Each structure stands twice: as structure tokens, then as C-alpha cells.
From Swiss-Prot:
InterPro entries: UPF0637 (IPR009403), UPF0637_domain_sf (IPR053707)
Domain of life (superkingdom): Bacteria
Gene3D superfamilies, A to Z: Protein of unknown function DUF1054
Record family assignment: Belongs to the UPF0637 family.
Protein name: UPF0637 protein SAR1080
């Protein structure tokens, strides 16, 4: 019995038709692990940064018609929410599990906060080959950093700084069949390794 990780069948919750039925599937197959990950990694971030982190599991409460295409747990230093702050995320679409750190378009002082990525431009480029960027958290697209030109990356960061709807996350994503999802031990090791790469961008 696993506590933290996800099986390929759990991702199929996003194939269930209808809002109520899909939410039921998400609640049964995905949300319990998100809560466990929330407990584990809020402690992890608190110990790594010296700041108190709180987990925020997506509720999808505002939805009245369209079922969610993804779900997540986010980590930030506010009990009230995470969207206004730089934050870490563990989440999933039907075809991927993703891990991210960055800034949403709703962030307070977004232009100032996004400049960390401008200052750490070289560090972004030096991330391992399987690291990606996400420029819209609502879409599954996450191009590999290694496939972006300098200009592509600079433009993406500038958009987060200057455009109201701009966002920027560094990310990592794996498929539902990935061997790192086969056990809690392998999954937690993958997540900790990823967050260790993200943390210098948080504390910069």
C-alpha cells in the first residue's frame, strides 16, 4: 500500500465525464496522496528555508460546469493562499505528473518577484536536461529548457515581468508510467531532488 505516489489508473480520473463524477474520482484516487504530500513537503520546505510553509490542496470549489483537467497541492508561506506568492507545486494532468516553482499572474509585486529568474538566468540554463519551463499553469505544455534559445528564455521571463497575464515556472514532468512513481521511496526521492534544484531560486 503506497501513501504518496500515484498509479497509472489514478491519472484516469481525468477521463471521467461530468463535473460531479470527475470530482468524485479525483477525491478518491488523487486527493488523499496530495494531502499526504502536503504534510510531508510543508515540513520539508520549512526545514530547508527556516520559513513556515503551508500546503494548499486544490478544491476546484468555483467549478459549476467544466470538470478540472488537472489538480495539485501548492506550498507557500501564507495560510490563506498561495497564488499571490512564489510557490512550489506538485500536480497532475491526465498524461503527466508535474513539479514546479514559480510565479502566477496573480502574484503580488509580480514584476519584482519575477526578476529572480532574470538574475538567475545562467542557473536556469544550467539545470539538468529534463527540466522545463511552464508559462501558463492552466496548460500541460512545458518545453524543455535545453530546447529554448537564449532569446526564447529571456522573452519568457520578460513576459512574466511586464505582461499582466505573464507567468513563469521552472518545472519537471514525468509520465504516469515512469518508474519513479513505482514506489513511495522512489517518488519522494524524485521530488526532493527536484525541489533541491528549485530552492536556490526561492531563496535568491
Amino acid at each position: 500500500m503506497t501513501k504518496y505516489t500515484f498509479k497509472p489508473k489514478d491519472f484516469k480520473a481525468f477521463n471521467v465525464e461530468g463535473l460531479d463524477a470527475r470530482m468524485e474520482a479525483v477525491n478518491e484516487y488523487i486527493r488523499p496522496q496530495l494531502h499526504e504530500l502536503g504534510e510531508y513537503f510543508s515540513d520539508f520546505f520549512t526545514s530547508q528555508t527556516g520559513e513556515t510553509f503551508y500546503p494548499h490542496v486544490a478544491k476546484h470549489a468555483r467549478r459549476s460546469v467544466n470538470p478540472p483537467k488537472d489538480t495539485w497541492v501548492a506550498f507557500a508561506t501564507s495560510k490563506r493562499g498561495y497564488k499571490m506568492l512564489p510557490h512550489f507545486q506538485i500536480g497532475m494532468f491526465e498524461d503527466q505528473l508535474f513539479v514546479m516553482f514559480g510565479i502566477m499572474h496573480e502574484a503580488k509585486d509580480k514584476a519584482t518577484r519575477a526578476k529572480v529568474f532574470e538574475r538567475k538566468f545562467k542557473a536556469i540554463q544550467q539545470l539538468p536536461d529534463d527540466y522545463r519551463v511552464c508559462l501558463d499553469h492552466m496548460k500541460p505544455d512545458k518545453p524543455f529548457i535545453k530546447d529554448l534559445t537564449d532569446d526564447d528564455l529571456k522573452e519568457a521571463i520578460q513576459r512574466a515581468i511586464n505582461v499582466k497575464k505573464g507567468e513563469f515556472f521552472i518545472a519537471r514532468a514525468i509520465t504516469p508510467q515512469d518508474k519513479r512513481l513505482k514506489s513511495d521511496k522512489a517518488f519522494i526521492a524524485f521530488l526532493e531532488e527536484t525541489f533541491d534544484q528549485f530552492l536556490p531560486f526561492y531563496s535568491a
